């Protein structure tokens, strides 16, 4: 189910699934996300539309763009209610809470005078693709902020410890979103996050699906950030903007968030040890991996501007994320079988043709898409039935597999 908050309010339909108060309650501090930017000649010819001076029109929503999520908050409350679940294992959850309270990055996201000067030196195609990267990243972080903030509000009475953890995660996500939106203003653009809150389409996921998906999102985010950071530390000439210097500490927020969501899953064994859990584990792994792989291959010029090979980078991130996920999920796809990435590479080629047809004004473009969509669906099915690994050795650190990876 996909609706905007504006449409829901207009129709008078209010549901526990929709985070209606997030627009009012979940608004971060003014200094965190509200920025101002003025249009500048450097952005002329890059193809960006503005709502008003310096405020960018959000990118069109597609299957691959960052989504805003909502869930059945009443059901989520029941999952972690102490009254309903008196034997809920809180030991690991409380350990995560103490980590969040430490707020290791409280003073990390402090800008310096190098940001704006560096932004003014980024021009042409590199400028365009980096602005797109900042927008997508900001939107994804802000989406997490809205979801976590509303979960914290709704669970405060039934499970105060879990609610506080979601609240502290929303603090981190707001910081990240604000930092990225401020970076956008260095490029003379910014997002109106309040407008996005009210007008973005919200995708409904059941509570357990939210936990699976956000766990994977946080863990893959960790590997993306740390991989880029380590690469640029070894190749400083490729670092054209100081944002990347913050990725080492930043990625630890993502890792801690993933650890908390892992603890949520372990506190509810039925989310990990049933046949249904095996099916959903593999499905969400594939969904996250496919989305990232196709997205990034549409933006190879961004990774090339950092001196990265897009294909090697993506495969490294997926392999490492999968290895981390093996310690928790009962089943994961065998991504280290070379045939796995062979199928993904075929999907990249088909997706490129679909993108080209979407931009075409030809009246036959819709018909020309049909065989490509059929081929894409067949590749998805191949991956769904692809060789899998029965794993789930929870809390076993590391991996005995040899690591001949690019980064």
Swiss-Prot record:
Similarity remark: Belongs to the AcsF family.
GO CC entries: chloroplast thylakoid membrane
A Gene Ontology biological process term: photosynthesis
EC number: 1.14.13.81
Pathway(s) where this gene product acts: Porphyrin-containing compound metabolism; chlorophyll biosynthesis
Record GO terms (molecular function): magnesium-protoporphyrin IX monomethyl ester (oxidative) cyclase activity; metal ion binding
Function, as annotated: Catalyzes the formation of the isocyclic ring in chlorophyll biosynthesis under oxygen- and copper-deficient conditions. Mediates the cyclase reaction, which results in the formation of divinylprotochlorophyllide (Pchlide) characteristic of all chlorophylls from magnesium-protoporphyrin IX 13-monomethyl ester (MgPMME).
This protein's name: Magnesium-protoporphyrin IX monomethyl ester [oxidative] cyclase 1, chloroplastic
Cofactor requirement: Fe cation
Catalytic activity: Mg-protoporphyrin IX 13-monomethyl ester + 3 NADPH + 3 O2 + 2 H(+) = 3,8-divinyl protochlorophyllide a + 3 NADP(+) + 5 H2O
Induction: Induced in absence of copper and oxygen. Regulated by CRR1 protein, which activates its transcription in absence of copper.
Disulfide bonds: none
InterPro entries in alphabetical order: AcsF (IPR008434), Ferritin-like_SF (IPR009078), Rr_diiron-bd_dom (IPR003251)
Subcellular location: Plastid, Chloroplast thylakoid membrane
Keyword Disulfide bond attached: no
Keywords: Chlorophyll biosynthesis, Chloroplast, Iron, Membrane, Metal-binding, NADP, Oxidoreductase, Photosynthesis, Plastid, Thylakoid, Transit peptide
Ranges where the record places region Disordered: 1-28
KW ATP-binding (keyword) present: no
NCBIfam families, A to Z: AcsF, PRK13654.1
The protein's enzyme class: oxidoreductase
PANTHER family hit by this protein: MAGNESIUM-PROTOPORPHYRIN IX MONOMETHYL ESTER [OXIDATIVE] CYCLASE, CHLOROPLASTIC
Compositionally biased residues, Polar residues: 1-10
């Amino acid at each position: 189910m996909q609706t905007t908050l504006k449409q829901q309010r207009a129709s008078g339909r209010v549901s526990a699934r929709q985070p209606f108060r997030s627009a009012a309650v979940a608004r971060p501090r003014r200094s965190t996300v509200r920025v101002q930017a003025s249009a500048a000649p450097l952005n002329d010819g890059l193809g960006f539309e503005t709502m008003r001076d310096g405020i960018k029109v959000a990118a069109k929503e597609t299957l691959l763009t960052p989504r805003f999520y909502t869930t059945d908050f009443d059901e989520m409350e029941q999952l972690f209610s102490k009254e309903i679940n008196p034997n809920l294992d809180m030991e690991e959850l409380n350990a995560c809470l103490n980590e969040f309270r430490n707020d290791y990055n409280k003073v990390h996201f402090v800008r310096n005078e190098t940001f704006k000067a560096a932004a003014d030196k980024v021009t042409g195609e590199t400028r365009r693709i980096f602005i797109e990267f900042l927008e997508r990243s900001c939107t994804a972080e802000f989406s997490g902020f809205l979801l976590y903030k509303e979960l914290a509000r709704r669970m405060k009475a039934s499970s105060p410890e879990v609610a506080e953890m979601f609240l502290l995660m929303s603090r981190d996500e707001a910081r990240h979103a604000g930092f990225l939106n401020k970076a956008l203003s260095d490029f003379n653009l910014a997002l109106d996050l309040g407008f996005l809150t009210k007008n973005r389409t919200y995708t409904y996921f059941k509570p357990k699906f939210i936990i699976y998906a956000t766990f994977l999102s946080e863990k893959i985010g960790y590997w993306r950030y740390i991989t880029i950071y380590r690469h640029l530390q070894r190749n400083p000439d490729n670092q054209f903007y100081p944002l990347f210097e913050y990725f080492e500490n930043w990625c630890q927020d993502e890792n801690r968030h993933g650890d908390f969501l892992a603890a949520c899953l372990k506190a509810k064994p039925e989310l990990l040890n049933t046949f249904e859990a095996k099916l959903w584990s593999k499905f969400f792994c594939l969904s996250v991996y496919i989305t990232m792989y196709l997205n990034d291959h549409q933006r190879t010029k961004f990774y090339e501007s950092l001196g990265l090979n897009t294909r090697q980078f993506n495969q490294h991130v997926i392999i490492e994320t999968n290895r981390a996920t093996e310690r928790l999920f009962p089943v994961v796809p065998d991504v280290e079988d070379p045939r796995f990435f062979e199928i993904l590479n075929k999907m990249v080629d088909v997706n490129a043709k679909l993108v080209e047809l979407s931009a075409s004004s030809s009246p036959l473009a819709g018909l020309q898409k049909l065989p490509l969509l059929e081929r894409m669906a067949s590749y998805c099915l191949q991956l769904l039935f692809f060789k899998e690994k029965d794993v789930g050795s929870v809390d076993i650190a590391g991996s005995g597999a040899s690591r001949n990876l690019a980064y």
